[in-house]
């Protein structure tokens, strides 16, 4: 016959094993549920994949609304190939020039320049230069570029 203390130790060990076995069973049930519901657990990951680019776009738009260009010059000038007897509508070159606030230059003081050259029918504005000396929000320059691109496409479709 076993001593009482040894019997008590064996009983405690058996109870502990039984509790541990139940816990293992609970863990396996959890893993089974996790396997079934893995889509739900993956949703935050997919949302993060979607929201990071959206956040970057919103940050960029916020910068475009808040940053300003120190100057904004539009120059319209005649093409050298135009002759006085040519009755075709004037194809002028439009140059939009403004500072690019997002790119840094070598010395950090002179900003780089972006120029957009477009050929559009702008006869009424021939040989004019418009200079807007005050500071313009960058978003307006984006809108202006879209407008001129649309103008070029519409002119191209009219002449073809």
From Swiss-Prot:
Q: Does the keyword Glycosyltransferase apply?
A: no
Which residues span the membrane?
39-59, 136-156
Task: Tell me what topology the record assigns in the membrane.
Answer: Multi-pass membrane protein
Question: Is Transmembrane among this UniProt entry's keywords?
Answer: yes
Q: Name one GO cellular component term.
A: membrane
What are the entry keywords? Membrane, Transmembrane, Transmembrane helix
Q: Which domain of life is it from?
A: Eukaryota
Q: Where in the cell is it found?
A: Membrane
A further note on this protein reads:
Completely overlaps YHL050C.
Q: Which family does it belong to?
A: Belongs to the UPF0479 family.
Q: What is this protein called?
A: Putative UPF0479 protein YHL050W-A
Q: Which organism is it from?
A: Saccharomyces cerevisiae (strain ATCC 204508 / S288c) (Baker's yeast)
Phylogenetic placement of the source organism = Eukaryota, Fungi, Dikarya, Ascomycota, Saccharomycotina
């Amino acid at each position: 016959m076993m001593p009482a203390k040894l019997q008590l130790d064996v009983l405690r060990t058996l109870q502990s094993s039984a509790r541990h076995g139940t816990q293992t069973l609970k863990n396996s049930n959890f893993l089974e549920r996790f396997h079934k519901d893995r889509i739900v657990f993956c949703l935050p990951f997919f949302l993060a994949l979607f929201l990071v680019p959206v956040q970057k776009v919103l940050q960029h738009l916020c910068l475009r609304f808040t940053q300003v260009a120190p100057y904004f010059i539009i120059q319209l000038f005649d093409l050298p190939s135009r002759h006085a007897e040519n009755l075709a509508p004037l194809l002028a070159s439009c140059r939009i020039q403004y500072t690019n606030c997002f790119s840094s230059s070598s010395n950090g003081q002179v900003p780089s320049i972006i120029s957009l050259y477009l050929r559009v029918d702008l006869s009424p504005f021939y040989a004019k230069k418009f200079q807007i000396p005050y500071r313009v929000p960058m978003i307006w320059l984006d809108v202006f570029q879209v407008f001129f691109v649309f103008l070029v496409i519409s002119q191209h479709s009219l002449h073809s």
